[in-house]
Amino acid sequence: MHRYLLILTSLWLFSVSMFAEGDLPIIEMKADRTMIYPQRMELTGEESLMDILQMVPDLMIAGYEDVISNYNLRIDNCPMNGDTRLILSQMKAKDIAKIQVCDNTGVAKGTIGTNRVLDINMKMPDALKGFVEAQGDFGKKVEGIGSANALYGSNSTDLYANASYRHNDGNEEYLTLHMTNRFDDRNRLLTYFTQQYLGQPSGKLRKVMGRARYFHTFNDLGTELLIVGGYQYYSDWSYSKKLPLYIVELNTPLFTKRLSMMLGVEGDFLMTRQKNADWSSNTFNNDVYLQFTYTLPKWRFTVGNRVMFYHYKMKDSGIIQKHSDTRDNANACIIFVPDNRNQILLGYYRKFYEPSDGLQEEQTINQMKLAYAYGKQKLTVQTEASYYIVEDDENFTKLGVSAYWKTIWLSLTGGSNLYIAKSGTYASFRLAPTAYLPYAWQIGLQVVCYTKKSPIREKTGEPVYASLSVNKQFGKRWNLGIDWHDMFDAICSDVTVNRYAANIKLQYRF
């Protein structure tokens, strides 16, 4: 009798835990970003980061090279210098705890203009795991690619390492190292280093970044201090750039647990030099930002502002020009969450275009956004509608919708984006089914159609982009994949770049 009671109790506890996990939202909206939690989805284990990102309406996979458009890829808010296409296709969703699609983080992250951020938080294993991979690109050009990736997790230390090498007309080398050290329950240090080297016939390009992020938690309420120090270096055949930076940020509840505050200061000093010429520029930025969020059971209210003090000095053939200005990014947002599956967002965002060297004219963008998200384990739907008012330029409207559906043997992602302006209206439509077949076979197809006035179609001459991928898993260690991308290049008479090609890859996991 006791044995039966024990079995029934165990089954009940297991079902409760499974229900609780399934009841958690897969998609979570915040004022300035959308969070996706892959661990709450039903995964086969072979889904890549690129597969998950196709759930986002604004992330139209434009082609083989232009993978994430003007999104900056980061890990734990540290920019990556790696081969973006490789990282997106190799990083598995099962190794990701959270994806932050930051489309309006002008206050929190200091992004300006239309710049946006993809911030990845890894799910570290209990031991060492990783892979080595060899790829070959075959088409008008033949390229060889080698890469290695490692994840290590323990009670006190996490480590992420990624390195890749690409050989074509020249050589491309990438290296990223990211380590987390937890000294105790209230202190941790994240250190980050990345470098990029491109050796092309036209010259050499090198990027180096280093950053340290220290977190200290003061109390059980979650009051946390962040201190960041970093350095970036860039050099090519024409210019060299040096950039030291710092951030000090405090996140804390204020008066009540429902009200939270983010307060920070950030600064950097960009030194640019033109080689073999008497030209240089120095840019000194200092930012102060403040954001409040008030949370109720079904409502979240956010308001924030970042004030940027900008000082610019340029020297050209002995002539010095100076310019100073003060600008601000702002947001105000309301989110309604009736339950764990439905969310509605209404927001206002103000941001500006940073002036380029020699051009000190501010251009402000005001965006009004309405968004809806529905998510459960096997089905997600996201819709977005935004109206942009651009200073001294054309106003426009953007509409987007995407849906993801999963069964035992098939997953289907589709969506559409619409751009409306006086100068012209265009749209794009995406469909990406993936079939999971017996004997560890996987077949995926991605098709994106563009209407006549689409900038991508005008640039490439291609009304349809398509790619076909076939993967076969051999046991637990080996994976073989073949991708046929830019499939319609060969038959489109108006195409400007004929690069129809195939990619073959072999991966060994440890």
Show which residues each predicted segment covers.
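Outer-membrane beta-barrel "beta-signal"
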Residues: 333, 481, 496-510
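Extracytoplasmic beta-strand/coil segments of soluble accessory domains associated
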Residues: 24-28, 50-81, 109
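N-terminal periplasmic accessory domains that precede
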Residues: 49-52, 86, 111-134, 146
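Flexible loop and strand-edge segments within Gram-negative outer membrane beta-barrel domains
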Residues: 167-247, 280-281, 352-362
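Transmembrane beta-strands of outer-membrane beta-barrel pores
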Residues: 135-140, 154, 165-169, 193-199, ...
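Short strand-turn segments of transmembrane beta-barrel domains in outer membranes
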Residues: 42, 126-150, 163
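Surface-exposed extracellular loop regions of Gram-negative outer-membrane beta-barrel proteins
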Residues: 124-127, 159, 174-188, 192-196, ...
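Short acidic/polar hinge/loop motifs at secondary-structure boundaries
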Residues: 78-105
